[in-house]
Amino acid sequence: MMNTEGNNGNKPLGLWNVVSIGIGAMVGAGIFALLGQAALLMEASTWVAFAFGGIVAMFSGYAYARLGASYPSNGGIIDFFRRGLGNGVFSLALSLLYLLTLAVSIAMVARAFGAYAVQFLHEGSQEEHLILLYALGIIAVMTLFNSLSNHAVGRLEVILVGIKMMILLLLIIAGVWSLQPAHISVSAPPSSGAFFSCIGITFLAYAGFGMMANAADKVKDPQVIMPRAFLVAIGVTTLLYISLALVVLSDVSALELEKYADTAVAQAASPLLGHVGYVIVVIGALLATASAINANLFAVFNIMDNMGSERELPKLMNKSLWRQSTWGNIIVVVLIMLMTAALNLGSLASVASATFLICYLAVFVVAIRLRHDIHASLPILIVGTLVMLLVIVGFIYSLWSQGSRALIWIIGSLLLSLIVAMVMKRNKTV
């Protein structure tokens, strides 16, 4: 465990610093990529799905906050797995699954970047090969950026958090004045399948709250500040998402939504803010998605470096290739590109949502096992675990009933993580 005293003495973070980190991590590319997908499923009830997604995130955030407060380190969820589950096959499999989850998320966001780029640069076109070209191109560019620079990643993110928030708030404020109640009134409750599918997808828009736990070792009084920070950050983000969902559904027709699901936020900007506003929102979406790919690649490469130092990856994966890049970096990037080409945005969102939910369910298990050490409430953890389990079962069942091929990729991700972990254990790599 890191020496927290040294960190605390050097510019300790306060409540609003941590809240800013959380909001910045959650309110990013995900909402640009996922709002349209959620609206396709729930239509006028989309805001309800974001509200329930926020409740699930609140429970999960509680477990994260207690663990982060008691075990402050920058290792995040990987460190939690090791502490609560040991260094066995199961812990390693979950770490690998989380790594895969981030890879799928990058592919999803790259798809969103491609959709916005085509919408902006080739107005009216939805050519698949153009979307894929831009998606693969941004992955390649950001991989190169990560290979060349370590420090620019953080600087870029700080600037873009402010830009993203300003654009979204501008859109919401403009939308409030022109809300059309008839478009957002819930005439009939959604089917259970659509509801659970949408909850799974909307939870992905909150998944960034885990980044706050990585800052716990820099907080002056983590036992007090971390739980409050998670509550405030997730609460504010929930209100923002609900407002944005109401605005988009009020101003984008069902026909447009079906046609432009991947760029729904930009479609809402056009009638509200005119062409100039539309351009601003699209540019904001391109910046947000590009920076998210950059930041997530940075996170993936750091996790791989961490796992390599713990001998949890084959030696080849950490072998230097060029500048800061390794063979492992290239292998993961190729895998990301293959997933980007093989799956559409909706399928990628489903895979990432399911694997995120499974990883965060494991965090509940860790928190329950360590509840006495982290001073956590067992009833809250049990309720959170049951809620998360219900969402996972409902989400997987909805995918199965729809015959979604994303289910095959989800099962494949689970099996691949488990098999690789077992093989490495057997070969005494770990």
Regions found by a protein language model. Name each.
Residues 1-45, 58, 62, 417-430:
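Membrane-interface "cap" regions at the ends of multi-pass membrane proteins
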